[in-house]
C-alpha cells in the first residue's frame, strides 16, 4: 500500500508521529479487497506481527527524523491508540511490528538487506537482542558474527545473516536442548 503523504508529513514539532503513520497504513490495508487478516492470526483476531517498509533508504529517512531507522515496536505504545492497547481496524487487532527502510543504504536501487529484516522481524516473533553496552556505553557485541540477534545481521553487508542459534531455537520452542553433565561422554 502507499500513503498519500510523504515521510516528512509525519514529523511535527520535532516529534515523529509514528503512531499516525502506522495507523493510517493499517486503515488503508484493511480496506483492500485482497486483505485477509485471518491468514495472519494464529488465534482469534490478533495479527501476530507485521512489517512497515518506509520508502527509500534509512539514511534519507534519518535526514527527516532521527527515529526513522529500522526497529521493532508495538502499536499500543507508539501513539496510535489512547488506551495502550493494540490498534483496532477492520475487525482485527495489530500490535507488534517491524519498521524498516525499503531500500539499501548506499545502493538505493537494491532492496534492503535480509540481515536487518531477519533481525527486526525476529523481535516481532519475540526474540531479544543479544548485544548490549557496558557501564561506559561501549558495545558488548555478544556472539557476533554467529548470531542474527547481534552483529551477525551485518554478515556479508547484511546479505547473509546466520541461522538462528540453539538458544534462539529453544526460546521459540522449535527445539529442546539437552544439558550435558561433566561426566557424560559426547560423541
What are these model-derived regions, one by one?
Residues 49, 55-187:
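Extracellular hydrolytic enzyme modules, especially secreted metalloproteases
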Amino acid at each position: 500500500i502507499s500513503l498519500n503523504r510523504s515521510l516528512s508529513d509525519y514529523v511535527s514539532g520535532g516529534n515523529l508521529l509514528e503512531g499516525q503513520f502506522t495507523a493510517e497504513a493499517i486503515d488503508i490495508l484493511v480496506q483492500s479487497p485482497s486483505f485477509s487478516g485471518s491468514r495472519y492470526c494464529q488465534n482469534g483476531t490478533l495479527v501476530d506481527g507485521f512489517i512497515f517498509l518506509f520508502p527509500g533508504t534509512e539514511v534519507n529517512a534519518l535526514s527527516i527524523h532521527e527515529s526513522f531507522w529500522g526497529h521493532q515496536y508495538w502499536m499500543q505504545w507508539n501513539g496510535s491508540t489512547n488506551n495502550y492497547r493494540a490498534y483496532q481496524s477492520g475487525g482485527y487487532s495489530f500490535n507488534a511490528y517491524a519498521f524498516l527502510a525499503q531500500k539499501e543504504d548506499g545502493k538505493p536501487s537494491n532492496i534492503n538487506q535480509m540481515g536487518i529484516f531477519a533481525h527486526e522481524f525476529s523481535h516481532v516473533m519475540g526474540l531479544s537482542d543479544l548485544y548490549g553496552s557496558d557501564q561506559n556505553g561501549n558495545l558488548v557485541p555478544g556472539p557476533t558474527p554467529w548470531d542474527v540477534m547481534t552483529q551477525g545481521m551485518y554478515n556479508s553487508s547484511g546479505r547473509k545473516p546466520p541461522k538462528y542459534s540453539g538458544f534462539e531455537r529453544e526460546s521459540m520452542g522449535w527445539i529442546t536442548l539437552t544439558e550435558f553433565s561433566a561426566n557424560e561422554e559426547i560423541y
